[in-house]
Amino acid sequence: MQSGNKFTTFWFNGQKYLSQDMEFTIFDLLNYFDYNPSLLVVEYNNSILIKKNWNKIVILNNDKIEVLTIVGGG
């Protein structure tokens, strides 16, 4: 019997990532990369996500996540 290694390939801000044997949410990913959630807009598979759903959506194989940072200026 082969080991149960499960790989998930996903795209984050245009870069390809590979995760092994780990399930994580959009919120987990943002924390890992040290983003400040109060200043972000997240696009998930070409749709803008509501912030309250970031902790509910588990990243799946071939998902595409883009993070837009809001900055002030004049």
Predicted features by range, described:
Residues 1-73:
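Ubiquitin-like/PB1-type beta-grasp interaction modules and other compact soluble beta-rich domains
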